A protein has these predicted regions:
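Short gly/pro-enriched beta-turn/loop segments at secondary-structure junctions
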Residues: 188-190
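Non-catalytic, usually N-terminal nucleic-acid engagement modules in DNA/RNA processing proteins
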Residues: 3-186
Length: 233
């Protein structure tokens, strides 16, 4: 119990950089590369839970902090004993930090050093996300892998803004880590915090961000700001 995430490469292709691997966490193993069904509000749409387990054989699914926070709300998930019990899925779950949804779905968002204020796309109520309360929310949701709160710049976006945004993401990461390190998991299994590399489509910024994030020495790192409208090349 409570072991840290471990990643091992299980096979490599001599003619390319393709490889397969295995991620081991408290709740089991995830063989990579993996298709991770999206269960935004906890459940994967159009699929019964038994199909998810028996037919699709999903080793991990994704939930979304922004959506779960707004509906059904963290209190309900917490009372149910965490997201796994709430949706009756005993394999690994990853939650993203809600950063992207704040920028793409909500209106009147205001980004400051402290965090982001935004209006719910459901009923227009105003909320405030900070690196600290996003970690708290994800602790209470109880996913196995939780993402750091970042700013996802839009595409296209000028160099100056992307650089400023990337630096903010790095400062927020420091705060995420400090909150994560000073809080405990609530449901008796280890959670892994994963930071996100930003930098838009600018190669030098991507490199700076990757180098900065590697310094934190997390068990895994994510690549953010992809599939936000940029061309495939």
């Amino acid at each position: 119990k409570n072991k840290l995430m471990i990643f091992e490469i299980t096979s490599e292709d001599s003619k390319s950089k393709a490889r397969t691997g295995k991620i081991t966490i408290d709740r089991g193993e995830i063989n990579t590369p993996i298709f991770m069904p999206v269960g935004t509000l906890g459940s994967v749409r159009g699929v019964h839970q038994h199909e998810l387990t028996d037919d699709i054989k999903s080793e991990i699914i994704l939930g979304n902090t922004y959506h779960l926070f707004l509906r059904p709300g963290v209190e309900i998930i917490n009372k149910a004993g965490g997201i796994h019990k709430f949706i009756n899925f005993d394999k690994p779950i990853l939650t993203d930090s809600g950063g992207y949804q704040v920028y793409s779905l909500s209106e009147n968002r205001k980004i400051s050093e402290e965090g982001v204020s935004f209006q719910s796309h459901i009923d227009g109520t105003t909320h405030f996300f900070t690196p600290e309360n996003v970690i708290d929310i994800q602790r209470r949701i109880g996913a196995d892998i939780i993402m750091a709160f970042d700013e996802c710049p839009p595409y296209p976006c000028d160099y100056k803004y992307v650089k400023k945004s990337m630096n903010l993401t790095h400062r927020w990461l420091k705060r995420c880590k400090s909150k994560f390190d000073s809080t405990a998991n609530l449901y008796g299994f280890n959670q892994t915090l994963v930071p996100i590399v930003q930098g838009g489509t600018y190669k030098d910024l991507r490199k700076i961000s990757a180098q900065k994030i590697v310094e934190f020495n997390f068990p895994a790192n994510a690549i953010g700001g992809l599939s936000v409208g940029e061309p495939h090349d």
